[in-house]
């Protein structure tokens, strides 16, 4: 499965380590720029102590190659970097070479979502030595992080045993780009949706959300908050139970669910975001079943990993 960017990346040529450019200048000075080379991207150990990894990020490599050019601002910045002994780190002639340079590479990669193992190539880059070197860091930046996220998501999805998993990770992600990468990789690895609207817009990932504790705290009582949310979102009403007390939240949610039934609607689900999730989700399931509401789904969030999720079904 491959999700292609619907936006054009910017500044990709400088999204690299300094030493890629110093080596490139050295190859240029040594007459090696056209020497043919092959670079293989692989990893040495499976992440998370597991038995496999899930490849991801490869679908964005074509855009990376296409947009990997040094514009005037890039050249100006590179010219401004001082050498330790004085002067500029990069020779004007080399910078002029970069200004007019376009990558000429052949790239083979395993499909995104495929299971991969240590010490086998995930991506093979072939072409002029200088091109292989220039793109190395940016390519690894795409593939390594998304493969890590996809692998973790795959483990979580397997632990969920067919129950839907949604990406709510934006607020803890490593910046805006990190949030997009997480949403993309999670979806490729089996997550059913994301809370990240920008990821939904760019990649076409289904979006999903509930409401926050702040919603409940904005009303005089929890019951008032639940009723207001049911009125505002009757077709996709998911109530968060643990703002104050989960057990009281269960009672209030059941009250609202019955009121929704009387109005011809149905409470879609409830969410629990804290406490002993394994214990509380089971108690909640029993309470809703006993109230004649077996269709109400139970959603859990907050610090969930594959081991916590396994405990929910134990």
Where are these predicted regions, by residue range?
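Ordered alpha/beta subdomains of enzyme catalytic regions
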Residues: 1-235, 262, 266
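Glycine-rich phosphate/ribose-binding loops and adjacent secondary-structure elements
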Residues: 214-314
């Amino acid at each position: 499965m491959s999700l292609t960017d619907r936006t054009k990346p910017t500044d990709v040529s400088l999204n690299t380590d300094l030493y890629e450019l110093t080596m490139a200048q050295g190859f240029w000075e040594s007459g090696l720029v056209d020497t043919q080379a092959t670079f293989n991207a692989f990893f040495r150990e499976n992440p998370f102590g597991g038995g496999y990894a899930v490849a991801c990020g490869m679908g964005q490599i074509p855009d990376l190659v296409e947009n990997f050019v040094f514009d005037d601002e890039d050249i100006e910045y590179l010219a401004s970097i001082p050498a330790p002994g004085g002067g500029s780190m990069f020779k004007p002639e080399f910078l002029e070479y970069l200004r007019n340079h376009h990558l000429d590479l052949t790239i083979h990669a395993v499909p995104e979502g495929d299971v991969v193992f240590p010490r086998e190539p995930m991506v093979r880059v072939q072409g002029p030595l200088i091109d292989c070197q220039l793109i190395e860091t940016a390519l690894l930046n795409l593939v390594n992080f998304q493969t890590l996220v996809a692998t973790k998501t795959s483990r979580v999805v397997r632990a969920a045993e067919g129950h839907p998993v949604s990406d709510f990770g934006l607020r803890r992600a490593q910046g805006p780009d990190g949030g997009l990468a997480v949403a993309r990789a999670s979806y490729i690895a089996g997550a059913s949706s994301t809370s990240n609207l920008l990821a939904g817009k760019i990649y076409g990932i289904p979006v999903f959300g509930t409401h926050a504790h702040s919603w409940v705290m904005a009303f005089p009582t929890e019951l008032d908050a639940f009723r207001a949310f049911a009125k505002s979102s009757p077709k996709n009403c998911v109530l968060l139970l643990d703002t104050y007390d989960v057990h009281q939240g269960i009672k209030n949610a059941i009250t609202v669910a019955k009121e929704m039934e009387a109005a011809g609607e149905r409470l879609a689900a409830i969410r629990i975001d804290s406490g002993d999730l394994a214990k509380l989700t089971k108690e909640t399931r029993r309470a809703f079943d006993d109230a004649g509401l077996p269709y109400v789904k139970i959603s859990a969030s907050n610090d969930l990993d594959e081991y916590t999720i396994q405990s929910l079904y134990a």
